């Protein structure tokens, strides 16, 4: 038996073990790459995830959700939200576009200089494109009202870039 689907094995050990135990052949769509290393089956899901991350984050900034009562775009006399996006791939770029469209102040961090150059060319003026390191993450985290994790390591679990204690600072 062969199963073709989005498995996300790296995030679900139980599922991984169950599939191994079943003896079925598993083809994880999210790991299928083309000749250039792109992930064409993951791209559409990533576009949606990036766009939805801003919508979902905005909800949790609202007071009824125990948020701080921050409106993404602000209002006259009140500054817009500061949004930190960790990762400048498909998810991060789509999140940045949506957040920028709401007139939020956006910082998108990545470690790939080619990707940063591309993002700097295509993003609107309210998006800062920065090289990611511990110092920059800590600095931007202090300013952020909303943080969106968008780092992808194909076939692996995303790295933990923020420690819980940093969220309390």
Per-region residue spans from a language model:
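Hydrophobic alpha-helical scaffolding
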Residues: 5, 43, 47, 106-109, ...
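Short, acidic/turn-prone active-site loops that include or flank metal/cofactor-
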Residues: 8-11, 31-33, 112-113, 133-135, ...
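Glycine/serine-rich phosphate-binding loop and adjoining beta1-alpha1 elements at the start
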Residues: 2-82
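Generic hydrophobic/aromatic pocket-lining and core-packing "Φ" positions
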Residues: 16, 54, 95-96, 116, ...
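Glycine-rich phosphate/diphosphate-binding loop of Rossmann-like nucleotide-binding domains
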Residues: 64-149
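Short amphipathic alpha-helical segments
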Residues: 16-17, 96-98, 120-121, 159-163
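Active-site glycine- and acidic-residue-rich loops that bind
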Residues: 127-129, 152-161
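Rossmann-fold NAD(P) dinucleotide-binding segment
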Residues: 1-10, 138-146, 156-169
């Amino acid at each position: 038996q062969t199963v073709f689907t989005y498995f996300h094995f790296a995030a679900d050990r139980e599922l991984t073990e169950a599939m191994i135990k079943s003896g079925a052949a598993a083809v994880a769509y999210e790991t299928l790459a083309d000749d250039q290393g792109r992930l064409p089956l993951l791209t559409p899901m990533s576009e949606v995830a990036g766009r939805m991350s801003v919508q979902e984050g905005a909800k949790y900034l609202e007071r009824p959700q125990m948020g701080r009562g921050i409106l993404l775009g602000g209002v006259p006399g009140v500054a817009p939200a500061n949004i930190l996006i960790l990762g400048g791939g498909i998810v991060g770029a789509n999140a940045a576009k949506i957040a920028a469209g709401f007139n939020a102040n956006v910082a998108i961090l990545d470690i790939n200089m080619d990707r940063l150059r591309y993002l700097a060319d295509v993003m609107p003026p309210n998006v800062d494109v920065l090289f990611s390191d511990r110092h920059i993450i800590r600095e931007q985290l202090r300013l952020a009202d909303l943080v969106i994790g968008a780092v992808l390591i194909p076939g692996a679990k995303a790295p933990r870039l923020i420690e819980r204690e940093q969220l309390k600072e």
